């Protein structure tokens, strides 16, 4: 019996020690044991005051192999997703709803009044503000109350002016605005915010903080892809979210891979599903989980030149709302008018950017922070059917997003694709030449098969709405939409990902001489010709067997 | 005895568990345990119907450290190496023979008639073909037989015209060709093929499929280097070959590192040497090993719009010819005229490419697939002695290939070198500054010494024809040709690999002040001067001890 | 008891086998277990004849995670640090002293006479030298003695001329210099050397050899950072130093990670501190440790065309001075005049370089070795207070070095920063957006806190002069200078590293709308306004709590 004990202890040690070692080796650099892929729903959920964050377990072999992590964020009406940044560049696809997103670039100017109001007013405002700040500096805190009052009035007036429209503002002459008005202008000034809506793709570089707010009338749902194996991430392959406010739970704290919290929290081995609204032990400890929390409160207060009470608020102590909070009343800040104007504004910005970039010889970030990030376009809508790059009336349509239509993607080395296949429509069998593809099923269903280098189907599944699956680089894949059609969004881990089709007018087969086909496949030349010319569609293939002459 | 059992079981577990763990850590990112290098012949062989594929075990520490894999492919006369692609960019050196290579870029036009015949004819042809295809679409399959007959006649005629030469074609006026001729033109149309011959280097990007065919009168032998640790490979460090036809064996299935075949094949632990013509168990299982094999036959047939029988042929079921097959009769397809014209054609293409690239600011792939890959030059011959970049009449010559003479190498981040040293000629001791060097011995023999950072010779060997060895980055190396001379080809894992010599006119020693040498090596100033000036050759050093005044 | 034996053997095996496995997994690609950081002094020291080399243990988790290694080199007066190169690009910061550094680029011309004397003289000299070399070739060795004598005289004369100054030289007409003088000019010719002094940063690419010499009147102290996880290093993550002279000890031979020496040296497990002046076992073995040592002596002699005795001297046999040697007398070589002229010279070079680079479209190394490395500027002084990029009269100043002011850093993908904070001055809390920061404390002390993604302080320490600590990418950090002020140098692992501040005029907080702050931190709008506007300084924050109006 003692021997048995020795033996099992031995076993235990071996499996504790070595298997742990093996587990952490599944990084893409080491080994991709892709014997079996699976389309999966998220397997971890964090409940917050005004929404929830669901994550896919990034320790799964397919995620490890592709070097990605993914999450789905649901923000309720009037919910604010607290500012955070990540160690990996990410693409966000807005599955549903409307809202506002603010990305913060330290050192960039707080442009949000100027860009929406007449520049003349903006200039006056700035001078005024400059003056006010000096007064504030000289007169100290006592003036605070009064200023705030002024500002509230100014804000109301400012909003009225906005609604009167831009035309009127431009009509106002240089000196047309009475001096008095300026005293009641709104005071708030901040960096650019961006409207987001269903179909938008937002690109966020590693280390860049962003927040978002649902000001629509339904839930705002977004799917995020983190490219953890990107060159921009110099830490390890674990996705890490750094929150700058609140007392958030770790979204990716799965399977004990991430560091255990320092205080007041036991490791939760094997517990993937977080209990919602669990008693937060941090509260008793008086320690939050955001970046401010780790600083000495006194030192932080000194650095910010505020009192320690405010510093403690930054540190998120006694905050149990988690990372998505409910805003008291409506969130009230300077916002751009929606729609056409915004689009024109962005187009102008983009033109300017491209001119700059041509002068720079295509070198992004070459001229420092100010000339690039501050004016960088971060989003593009690919939900509009008119925007389709590939369209087959009887099969479906595909829209692609790459560095040509969203230049920041060149820097991030990511691209994306959104597709809608009609019932039984077939996505031509193909392989991804230079990227992994991470596919999220927006709506509908499809039969998907993925094939490895040995000719084995490592994925053969009916994928459903809300699931996500990975098609590794170079692996063959075929997809056929189900009865409900198939609507998906695909993240690709290269700036201009492209595919090589195995059927259709641009397929591999078409590129080969007839006799090579005939010999390779042991078929007649007639059959070879059929292989080459029986399909006139390119990527979106209709399912009917009849020949068509559509070119 | 029971104790002994426990003990050995323990040991077993430890070595099974932990050593396996250690083994898979030898990726370049982790550790290079380069205590001993060795020049080796391939240690795995796959016999196919019309040739063989030999591979070097990529799990060896030196290969793992350098992040490369290598194979040698022998194609018999009239043999066709089936189309395949790899997860790693590769360089192919043609050691012997002649043939044709076709690289497939999905979406690129099928240009092979136009580029070899007059453009006027090509245009007419295209229109005709367009018309024929529409007819085909309208009239369906019945016409197939007839078309094929027409086409055969057209092909014969086409070949006659080719032999009449290009000049005559150009003399023919716009309308000079009778309408009747066009009906008998050859029909086949496919992507560019490239003639290959001894001394050619061909660059194939990751994920790009290619096939090759031996139409010469001797065996076609090629050595392939796969740069698996390239950024272009987002999978793991294992080389993977994806075949698009046939029922191939896994060329790199060594030491159980690759995934075992899903069906019908047991793991073959430790069995490096494949039995030739082994009974293929796939045949009984009815499952092939190419990419098509993994798709559902019915779905594949639907996608291709062919019958299921043809789809099954694509899947390579019941095919036991392996990856190199014997062509029935001669492989008959549109081919470019050989020699001077081809060269001129390519040069024109290259000029155009360079102009484009200058306009683009040197950004390859920046403008999408069509403008780059489709017109990209993939090969360059470095076998011609006249082409030598370094030549020493009494020692030997070296030709280099980098992104300047083959621009795609900038994109692939690879370069190459071919050298021929006369008997006793010395390759100056040197180190590779920015690349690993993987050297294949084409002919002859040499004494090679490689030195690590501790001053230890980790390779000291008489290398022979057919062997391959790795000189890791920064390691010192010296080579002296043997009695038969020394002819080699070196793959380098950086686009413009360069070396730093330790002897010769451009050596490290020459760059140092006399007194630094005198003090560092505890020698007199006179000796220091000798170190600097006793060798007037640069890299290829003659072995005689006499001083020479050649500068 | 036997059982106990089995058990402990088991344990032993498990811990030997598996823990070793775990240890080597701490590469950045795998896992960053950064639960605890620490500012540390070097923990390994090698004593040499004229100085010492101290290294930080690169196997520590923080170094492994950041992919860096570091050393501090102290060269005594008249000491020569023998030529070496490394597998990683490095930045060298000169903490103290003056000296000369020579970087060797194989194949670049030996330009050092021309650039320091009048070009007219230089031209004559070159012609003369050419002639002399030919004579040497023709007349062989007998002339050696005589030449050397001439040269010594020439050298003395040359130095006098230098001291007479450059103006005079330029006044001398084309033919003004008597023929006789030219016969007595100094003979030595070598590649460019560069003067180094306190405050200089020198960038050395991977695989590029350099040597340095202390010709000042105090110790020359330098701190080196090696970016081992750089793309330029294709070997593993271990820093490797390849010496080209002497019989050096392995500076980074810690914890048995590096390969044990082949001969005559036992593994020294756990022995971090090297005994100074230990009996060198190599002497008995007759084998050195530099790159030449590993070559066959006869073959080396043949390659260099020198006798075997000289070859043996190159191999460093019987040399026990280690890597820093004392020069006999003064090291006597061609040197540039110091100061203003040098600066002007470099500025001219830089202008030229930038013009070239604009023409090249910003593509470094695109045109081969000759046009880039040979004329590349390698150093820049950031010690001068006037050079500050950020300055706050009551807090301190910061100078940054990136690819804009030292273009080679774009190629190396490194940047740097030097800062001086006055007593109690605060470096604004911030995070590194795109780089790790490796900080060396030059003088003074500071309180430093580093915070991870869970809000835990993983570093909270009073850092002292001579210590080094790592601030990982994206981790929050705050620093407050102690009573003695705080002077530091920070290496950053990205070409244009930038930070995002959490306090100050450009902070994250300032970019957010008031109401977002109010809701996120559960504070009033007034408090939110204070958070945004209470600090007018940007990065260097003064510690006093009073409000200031300085903008």
UniProtKB/Swiss-Prot annotation, chains A, B, C:
<keyword id="KW-0020">Allergen</keyword>
<dbReference type="InterPro" id="IPR022379">
    <property type="entry name" value="11S_seedstore_CS"/>
</dbReference>
<keyword id="KW-1015">Disulfide bond</keyword>
<feature type="region of interest" description="IgE-binding">
    <location>
        <begin position="225"/>
        <end position="239"/>
    </location>
</feature>
<feature type="compositionally biased region" description="Low complexity">
    <location>
        <begin position="351"/>
        <end position="361"/>
    </location>
</feature>
<feature type="compositionally biased region" description="Polar residues">
    <location>
        <begin position="311"/>
        <end position="323"/>
    </location>
</feature>
<feature type="disulfide bond" description="Interchain (between acidic and basic chains)">
    <location>
        <begin position="108"/>
        <end position="374"/>
    </location>
</feature>
<feature type="region of interest" description="IgE-binding">
    <location>
        <begin position="118"/>
        <end position="132"/>
    </location>
</feature>
<feature type="disulfide bond">
    <location>
        <begin position="32"/>
        <end position="65"/>
    </location>
</feature>
<dbReference type="GO" id="GO:0043245">
    <property type="term" value="C:extraorganismal space"/>
</dbReference>
<feature type="region of interest" description="IgE-binding">
    <location>
        <begin position="161"/>
        <end position="175"/>
    </location>
</feature>
<feature type="region of interest" description="Disordered">
    <location>
        <begin position="111"/>
        <end position="194"/>
    </location>
</feature>
<feature type="compositionally biased region" description="Low complexity">
    <location>
        <begin position="168"/>
        <end position="185"/>
    </location>
</feature>
<feature type="compositionally biased region" description="Polar residues">
    <location>
        <begin position="282"/>
        <end position="293"/>
    </location>
</feature>
<dbReference type="InterPro" id="IPR014710">
    <property type="entry name" value="RmlC-like_jellyroll"/>
</dbReference>
<dbReference type="GO" id="GO:0045735">
    <property type="term" value="F:nutrient reservoir activity"/>
</dbReference>
<feature type="signal peptide">
    <location>
        <begin position="1"/>
        <end position="20"/>
    </location>
</feature>
<dbReference type="InterPro" id="IPR006044">
    <property type="entry name" value="11S_seedstore_pln"/>
</dbReference>
<dbReference type="InterPro" id="IPR006045">
    <property type="entry name" value="Cupin_1"/>
</dbReference>
<feature type="region of interest" description="IgE-binding">
    <location>
        <begin position="281"/>
        <end position="295"/>
    </location>
</feature>
<comment type="subunit">
    <text>Hexamer of two trimers; each subunit is composed of an acidic and a basic chain derived from a single precursor and linked by a disulfide bond.</text>
</comment>
<keyword id="KW-0732">Signal</keyword>
<dbReference type="InterPro" id="IPR011051">
    <property type="entry name" value="RmlC_Cupin_sf"/>
</dbReference>
<comment type="function">
    <text>Seed storage protein.</text>
</comment>
<dbReference type="GO" id="GO:0034214">
    <property type="term" value="P:protein hexamerization"/>
</dbReference>
<comment type="similarity">
    <text>Belongs to the 11S seed storage protein (globulins) family.</text>
</comment>
<feature type="region of interest" description="IgE-binding">
    <location>
        <begin position="510"/>
        <end position="524"/>
    </location>
</feature>
<feature type="compositionally biased region" description="Low complexity">
    <location>
        <begin position="114"/>
        <end position="124"/>
    </location>
</feature>
<dbReference type="GO" id="GO:0048316">
    <property type="term" value="P:seed development"/>
</dbReference>
<feature type="compositionally biased region" description="Low complexity">
    <location>
        <begin position="254"/>
        <end position="275"/>
    </location>
</feature>
<protein>
    <recommendedName>
        <fullName>Prunin 1 Pru du 6.0101</fullName>
    </recommendedName>
</protein>
<keyword id="KW-0758">Storage protein</keyword>
<feature type="region of interest" description="Disordered">
    <location>
        <begin position="311"/>
        <end position="361"/>
    </location>
</feature>
<feature type="region of interest" description="Disordered">
    <location>
        <begin position="238"/>
        <end position="293"/>
    </location>
</feature>
<dbReference type="Pfam" id="PF00190">
    <property type="entry name" value="Cupin_1"/>
</dbReference>
<feature type="short sequence motif" description="NGXEET; peptidase recognition motif">
    <location>
        <begin position="367"/>
        <end position="372"/>
    </location>
</feature>
<feature type="domain" description="Cupin type-1 2">
    <location>
        <begin position="380"/>
        <end position="529"/>
    </location>
</feature>
<keyword id="KW-0708">Seed storage protein</keyword>
<feature type="domain" description="Cupin type-1 1">
    <location>
        <begin position="37"/>
        <end position="312"/>
    </location>
</feature>
<dbReference type="InterPro" id="IPR050253">
    <property type="entry name" value="Seed_Storage-Functional"/>
</dbReference>
<feature type="compositionally biased region" description="Basic and acidic residues">
    <location>
        <begin position="339"/>
        <end position="350"/>
    </location>
</feature>
<feature type="compositionally biased region" description="Low complexity">
    <location>
        <begin position="132"/>
        <end position="148"/>
    </location>
</feature>
